[in-house]
Swiss-Prot record:
<keyword id="KW-0472">Membrane</keyword>
<keyword id="KW-1133">Transmembrane helix</keyword>
<dbReference type="GO" id="GO:0006865">
    <property type="term" value="P:amino acid transport"/>
</dbReference>
<dbReference type="InterPro" id="IPR035906">
    <property type="entry name" value="MetI-like_sf"/>
</dbReference>
<dbReference type="InterPro" id="IPR000515">
    <property type="entry name" value="MetI-like"/>
</dbReference>
<keyword id="KW-0813">Transport</keyword>
<keyword id="KW-0029">Amino-acid transport</keyword>
<dbReference type="GO" id="GO:0043190">
    <property type="term" value="C:ATP-binding cassette (ABC) transporter complex"/>
</dbReference>
<comment type="similarity">
    <text>Belongs to the binding-protein-dependent transport system permease family. HisMQ subfamily.</text>
</comment>
<feature type="transmembrane region" description="Helical">
    <location>
        <begin position="203"/>
        <end position="223"/>
    </location>
</feature>
<keyword id="KW-1003">Cell membrane</keyword>
<comment type="function">
    <text>Part of the ABC transporter complex GluABCD involved in glutamate uptake. Probably responsible for the translocation of the substrate across the membrane.</text>
</comment>
<feature type="domain" description="ABC transmembrane type-1">
    <location>
        <begin position="33"/>
        <end position="224"/>
    </location>
</feature>
<keyword id="KW-0812">Transmembrane</keyword>
<comment type="subunit">
    <text>The complex is composed of two ATP-binding proteins (GluA), two transmembrane proteins (GluC and GluD) and a solute-binding protein (GluB).</text>
</comment>
<feature type="transmembrane region" description="Helical">
    <location>
        <begin position="37"/>
        <end position="57"/>
    </location>
</feature>
<dbReference type="InterPro" id="IPR043429">
    <property type="entry name" value="ArtM/GltK/GlnP/TcyL/YhdX-like"/>
</dbReference>
Length: 277
């Protein structure tokens, strides 16, 4: 393969020099990178909100709400992201639901939000279901309502337990933003190909785009790992504080008013005489 690339001139130095020109970055790569980050951040935030609401609705005590959320989750998890983007693009364009300049962006965010939100909902539902049932029962026994139990007891633990899966889903959302290329959205892959069509360096352009995506994924993973460490440290501090008694132990309270020096091996019991009548 290397010899074939060498024969086609794809490994020549002049194929890589355009990336040393600031104009290549300001014209193609940086606008595409901004488009990728903008779509990914918007869709991840909306997917987290949607996934939380659907996940809680999936475990609701209201049967109709459980069925409704379950239908939404299973439907949008089964549809490919690209089909969701194309459907949203045609829907928004036909009924003029969004401005024409934001049409591709809205379609990309819609597709990523609906798919990843459904997956996140199932992740949260599984995380809550994996917690011991005794925690819910204890909270209810203490007088907490179902909503208080879910938001204050179950949901924080489920998020902490399922954080690696949530991080993986965020990375998937970031990479799937490249599918917006099919509906004309300007993101980093499309910008890289546009740059390659001008400079005739497709291999170099795709390699640079791949490095950019890898760096973004590493940064997202590092941020999530830092958040996870802070969550674990916070739980550890709370456990330590919970185990420290509020008052020091004062020893045994004897009923017969016996003072005992437990430090002296030859201690003697000294009894205080009771009140004389």
């Amino acid at each position: 393969m290397g010899s074939v690339l060498q024969e086609n001139g794809q490994l020549d130095g002049d194929k890589w020099t355009p990336f040393l020109d600031p104009q290549t970055w300001t014209t193609y790569l940086l606008p595409g990178l901004w488009g990728t980050l903008k779509a990914a951040v918007a869709s991840i935030l909306l997917a987290l909100i949607m996934g939380t609401l659907l996940g809680l609705g999936r475990i609701s005590e209201i049967r109709l709400l459980r069925w409704f959320c379950g239908i939404i989750i299973e439907t949008f998890r089964a549809i490919p992201v690209l089909i969701l983007m194309i459907f949203a693009y045609q829907l928004f364009a036909r009924y003029q639901l969004v401005p024409s300049r934001q049409l591709a962006f809205a379609a990309v965010v819609f597709g990523l939000t609906m798919y990843n939100g459904s997956v996140i909902a199932e992740i949260l539902r599984s995380g809550i279901a994996s917690l011991p049932k005794g925690q819910r029962e204890a909270a209810i026994a203490l007088g907490m309502s179902t909503r208080q139990t879910t938001w204050s007891i179950l949901l924080p633990q489920a998020v902490a337990a399922m954080l690696p899966a949530l991080i993986a889903q965020m990375v998937i959302a970031l990479k799937d933003s490249a599918l917006g290329y099919q509906i004309g959205y300007i993101e980093v892959v499309r910008s890289g190909i546009q740059s390659a069509s001008v400079n005739r360096n497709y291999l170099a352009a795709l390699a640079v785009v791949a490095v950019i995506m890898i760096l973004i994924n590493f940064a997202l993973t590092a941020l999530a790992e830092r958040i996870q460490r802070q969550l674990r440290a916070g739980r550890a501090r709370r456990n330590i504080v919970a185990k420290v008694p509020e008052e020091p132990d004062q020893g045994l309270d004897t009923k017969d008013n016996v003072n005992v020096d437990w430090h002296d091996p030859d201690y003697k019991e000294v009894k205080h005489p009771g009140p004389s009548f």
